[in-house]
């Protein structure tokens, strides 16, 4: 392996990052190159090219198993711990957002995360969609400006809350966004009023 300026070689393109993400997700698993390519969502040839560099950096081991090569993550590699921490941080990114929202949001009847961030289909510029149900809509709206500033400052995404009274929430059951929301959401605080009022 190299000992200086090696991150370009390890993480230098999307293919390598996707391959490493798969290897760390299934640490200990033995892969054929074809299986590794399939799980990583990448074509076979670029995976082969990436594996040559990763093997050279002592991150993967390649063994002959009959006519095929078997790939395993080298968990004794000097680079295993920093990369493990990197992918763990990525895996927990949404949970860190939820933890911050739990701290920052004012007390409400219900706060839920929904939309692309919840489903995992977000893009770089996607909004953070939050639904809040409260007895005092105006008071909560006034308190959200500081939350919006802090969330955007920390995560870079625009904070996009929908604030409803309990009466408005009950009436919103058949709106298009409500039908989508009810299929995939995460309760941040308060009670699950979606299950109580929308799914009756």
PLM features: residue spans?
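Short helix-loop-helix/strand-helix junction enriched in hydrophobic and basic residues
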Residues: 110-117
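Short His-Asn-centered micro-motif
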Residues: 114, 133-134
């Amino acid at each position: 392996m190299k000992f200086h300026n090696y991150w370009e070689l390890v993480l230098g393109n999307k293919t390598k990052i996707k391959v490493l993400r798969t290897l760390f997700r299934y640490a200990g698993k033995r892969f054929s190159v074809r299986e590794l390519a399939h799980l990583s969502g990448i074509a076979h040839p670029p995976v082969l090219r990436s594996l040559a560099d990763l093997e050279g950096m002592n991150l993967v081991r390649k063994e002959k198993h009959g006519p095929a090569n078997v790939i395993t993550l080298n968990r004794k590699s000097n680079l295993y711990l920093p990369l493990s921490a990197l992918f763990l941080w990525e895996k927990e990114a949404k949970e860190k957002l939820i933890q911050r929202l739990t701290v920052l949001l004012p007390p409400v009847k219900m706060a839920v995360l929904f939309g692309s961030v919840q489903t995992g289909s977000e893009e770089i510029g996607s909004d953070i969609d939050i639904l809040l149900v409260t007895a005092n809509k105006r008071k909560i709206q006034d308190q959200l400006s500081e939350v919006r500033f802090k969330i955007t400052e920390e995560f870079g995404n625009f904070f996009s809350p929908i604030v409803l009274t309990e009466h408005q929430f009950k009436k919103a059951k058949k709106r298009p966004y409500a039908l989508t929301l009810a299929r995939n959401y995460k309760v941040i605080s308060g009670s699950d009023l979606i299950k109580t009022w929308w799914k009756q």
